[in-house]
Amino acid sequence: MISSEEKAKIKEEIVDKVNSCLEKNGESFRMDKVTVLNREETVKFMGSYRVYDRRKYGAVSREINSFLKKYGDVEIKSKKIRDSGMKFTTVSFNFEL
């Protein structure tokens, strides 16, 4: 099982990296937190972010996905959203350690 300090470090690392990538690409959305689900044998980390400029989605997702893969097998899902005239792509991810 991963210690509380390690969990906190991983959560902070992910939020910092995702927000840095979004800011670098001129995106207004910022990730607040990563959720942790403690299981009997493993710990599951889950989060999501948005990309508003669909032309930048490829570059943003490639950079973030390559960073997340350092934690192992990552499940990543994306969905295009149109809400009250706003268009964006929401990306959710999760992995277990």
PLM regions with names:
Residues 27-55:
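Short glycine-rich, basic-tinged beta-strand/loop micro-motifs
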Residues 31-36, 75-82:
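Short amphipathic beta-strand and strand-loop transition segments with alternating hydrophobic
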Residues 6, 10, 14, 52-64:
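Short amphipathic alpha-helical segments
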Residues 58-76:
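Short, non-transmembrane amphipathic alpha-helical segments
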